[in-house]
Amino acid sequence: MSISVTSHNDVSKLERIGAHSHIKGIGLNDNLEPKESSQGMVGQVKARRAAGVILKMIQEGRIAGRAILMAGPPSTGKTAIAMGMAQSLGSDTPFVTLSASEVYSLEMSKTEALLQALRKSIGVRIKEETEIIEGEVVEVQIDRSITGGNKQGKLTIRSTDMETVYDLGTKMIDSLTKEKVLAGDVISIDKSVGRVTKLGRSFSRARDYDAMGADTRFVQCPQGEIQKRKEVVHTVSLHDIDVINSRTQGFLALFSGDTGEIKPEVREQINTKVSEWREEGKAEIVPGVLFVDEVHMLDIECFSFFNRALEDDLAPIVIMASNRGITRIRGTNYRSPHGIPVDLLDRMLIISTLPYSHEEVKEILKIRCQEEDVDMEPSALDYLSTIGQETSLRYALLLISSSNQVALKRKSATIEESDIRRVYELFLDQKRSVEYLEEYGKNYITENEWSASGAQDNAVAMQED
């Protein structure tokens, strides 16, 4: 007699951990006082308080068309504060992230790319009234033709006060079949589009079955009228409206991504229409946030465009980040603070970030270990904090996952100081890499050698001719 054993393989959920996935907000209380460590944010008290004031004004809709510059050395949390602001604003307020190098493309001009990013950052909250049918299904009758013709049926639906019978067409029957609507289900039907939504199962049918699925939800039978008018709010960006009205394929261009350049006339017509909706009370503008990282990579034409775009009445809040000091403005020979023209700097509120202390680096590394589900001994954490203080925070963060692999190799679930030392010897940081280049630089091929060898090859080719 043979016994068959069935093995079960657990399918692990794919989870990607990003550089800022541990950040849930900017860590402020109701009085805009920053906590030392909260919502994944550590240190940078002054910068977070300033960001909190900006955040409060954005939420209240008081400011728009302002520019904020976050300036500070590398690895001081500029992008982290911006990501924290995005988390605090929520999904209803548009927050668009743009790297300055994304602007340069062969398919569209620089100003068009910036203008599309600006209009993605402005939301339009459109209100409309729709008529819905809401109630508990008493009976669904479907008559199918023997010859395969159109299906017909009747839907009996009730509330606590009344009961009504509706005639069903082919499309409505297909929608009910797709949602698997049965007698006893509480449903909602949008009359304008014919969309059927199953809200749950009525409490009166709770004893129909002995066993129920985990996703079964019981709700009360709706009260009052079966047909009701309901206000629905949709939030779309101005860019979405631009794309739908500018392309022949309409909304399909949103999914293909091939938006191309949009004519100014189309945008003017949309701005006029949105202004009419605002006056009629049908829509309201939601000024969002455009975050431009590595802003010093933009050239003088882009900065000139921002000078004009920020003065527009439909302009979002633009947050820029730069880690440059006094450097050359791209496209010119002039030097300026942060690589940004002085006339644009004059329009900005500047938030500065400072290097982290040893204790702050240690706290950030501890939060990242929790995020990556890694156990680390206190001595190893101290040593890694020292490395982060002497080299850079990013380098120390990268050593967490690699040292965890070394620990797993020796069958240990906890990272020890020896594991950190091992990966520190294997992977160079920026300072040690420069020292290595200075020591062994003569063995590398340099630009001068390439140019010399190229000239020699040209001379040989000319002699052969």
UniProtKB/Swiss-Prot annotation:
Catalytic activity as recorded in UniProt: ATP + H2O = ADP + phosphate + H(+)
Record has Chloroplast as a keyword: no
Binding site for ATP: 72-79
Any Pfam family matching the protein: TIP49_C
GO terms (BP aspect): box C/D snoRNP assembly; chromatin remodeling; DNA repair; regulation of transcription by RNA polymerase II; rRNA processing
Cellular localization per UniProt: Nucleus
EC number(s) recorded for this UniProt protein: 3.6.4.12
Molecular function, one GO term: ATP hydrolysis activity
Keywords: Activator, ATP-binding, Chromatin regulator, DNA damage, DNA repair, Helicase, Hydrolase, Nucleotide-binding, Nucleus, rRNA processing, Transcription, Transcription regulation
Gene3D superfamilies in UniProt: 1.10.8.60, P-loop containing nucleotide triphosphate hydrolases, RuvB-like helicase, domain II
GO CC terms of this entry: cytosol; Ino80 complex; NuA4 histone acetyltransferase complex; nucleus; R2TP complex; Swr1 complex
UniProt enzyme class: hydrolase
InterPro entries: AAA+_ATPase (IPR003593), P-loop_NTPase (IPR027417), RuvB-like (IPR027238), RuvB-like_C (IPR041048), RuvBL1/2_DNA/RNA_bd_dom (IPR042487), TIP49_P-loop (IPR010339)
The keyword RNA-binding belongs to this UniProt entry's keyword annotation: no
Subunit structure: May form heterododecamers with RVB1. Component of the SWR1 chromatin remodeling complex, the INO80 chromatin remodeling complex, and of the R2TP complex. Interacts with dil1.
Record-stated family: Belongs to the RuvB family.
Protein role: DNA helicase which participates in several chromatin remodeling complexes, including the SWR1 and the INO80 complexes. The SWR1 complex mediates the ATP-dependent exchange of histone H2A for the H2A variant HZT1 leading to transcriptional regulation of selected genes by chromatin remodeling. The INO80 complex remodels chromatin by shifting nucleosomes and is involved in DNA repair. Also involved in pre-rRNA processing.
Name of the protein: RuvB-like helicase 2
Organism: Schizosaccharomyces pombe (strain 972 / ATCC 24843)
Gene encoding the protein: rvb2
